[in-house]
Amino acid sequence: MPQYKLSEIAKLLNLTLQGDDIEVVGVNTLQDASPNEISFLANAKYIHQLVLSQAGAIILSKEYASRVPRALISTEPYRDFGRVLSLFSIPQGCFDGISHQAYIHPTAQVSKTATIYPFVFIGSHTVIEENTTLFPGVYIGEHCHIGKNCTIYPNTVLMANTSIGNDCIIHAGVVLGSDGFGFALTEEKQKIPQVGNVIIKDKVEIGANTTVDRGTLGTTTINENTKIDNLVQIGHGVTVGKNTVIVSQVGISGSTSIGDNCILAGQAGISGHLTIGNNVTIGPQSGIGKNIPDNQILGGSPAVDRQTFLKTSVLMPRFPELFKRIKKLEKILEKKKEHNI
């Protein structure tokens, strides 16, 4: 297990050390940390735990530093906690090299520095670049390209002509390039061949059991530094912009474009052939059925602006009561009409 002096961590992360130097052997929560572990405070609602915490040091902002005897002062405590965690985390896996139990087509090009576990399948004319790791059960179809420093976890599938950039993480069970949902609306529901492809740009992370489909023609694209949670469905021909976050169980229908720096919260549903602008936040379980311009915050189904959504959410539990009152008023008005009042 790695060990660091607190002063070493401060230097590596360019943080300010407050208090004396100690040896640190791990990372833990404020509640569970021991005197030789480091913790963090990123949310003020946990500030009461500072007094009770046994952590040897705490990563926190300058305004709270006086409350603890030993601290690493940070402008972004949660980010720097992640960086410290990386120092102590042990990489998954126990295999180096290229297994003779993997199938690699003779026309495939696999870097000597790649790690290919047993029972990986690599199809014809596929390229695997330097320092990329493929865990057991990964299937890579023909004419695929995987860039440098990627990690692809077990039982992931890349269908033919799928491309992944550099520094990507693809979690277990992901399927990239499966057929989009394309059928002619005839009595036979004839299948339309899906011969497009999927391109994943640099520094993308895709969570477990997410699917990104290819279309009839053209490309489904996930752009740089976008982060996708588990169990997300991205339809054929979709484009997702840079630095966008997509949370679990979101569904995006075919040929929709999502802009840069967007947040799609859990279980949001986006109809097909739409354009969602840049810097858009879509709340959980929202239903989007029209184009959305830049810089919007939306909620509800059908989705409306955030303020309207919050107001209607407050009113909704009162609807039965209000309905009764309206019916009562209607009866009073009817009686007045009958008596010409």
From Swiss-Prot:
Coiled coil: none annotated. InterPro entries: Hexapep, Hexapep_transf_CS, LpxD, Trimer_LpxA-like_sf, UDP_GlcNAc_AcTrfase_non-rep. It catalyses: a UDP-3-O-[(3R)-3-hydroxyacyl]-alpha-D-glucosamine + a (3R)-hydroxyacyl-[ACP] = a UDP-2-N,3-O-bis[(3R)-3-hydroxyacyl]-alpha-D-glucosamine + holo-[ACP] + H(+). The keyword Transmembrane does not apply. Gene3D superfamilies: Hexapeptide repeat proteins (2.160.10.10), MurE/MurF, N-terminal domain (3.40.1390.10). The active site is at H236. Pathway: Bacterial outer membrane biogenesis; LPS lipid A biosynthesis. GO terms for molecular function: N-acyltransferase activity. It holds the Pfam family Hexapep. It comes from the Bacteria. Keywords: Acyltransferase, Lipid A biosynthesis, Lipid biosynthesis, Lipid metabolism, Repeat, Transferase. One of its GO terms (cellular component) is membrane. Its EC number is 2.3.1.191. SUPFAM superfamilies: Trimeric LpxA-like enzymes (SSF51161). The keyword Repeat applies. GO terms for biological process: lipid A biosynthetic process. Catalyzes the N-acylation of UDP-3-O-acylglucosamine using 3-hydroxyacyl-ACP as the acyl donor. Is involved in the biosynthesis of lipid A, a phosphorylated glycolipid that anchors the lipopolysaccharide to the outer membrane of the cell. Belongs to the transferase hexapeptide repeat family. LpxD subfamily. Homotrimer. This is UDP-3-O-acylglucosamine N-acyltransferase. It comes from Lawsonia intracellularis (strain PHE/MN1-00). The gene is lpxD.
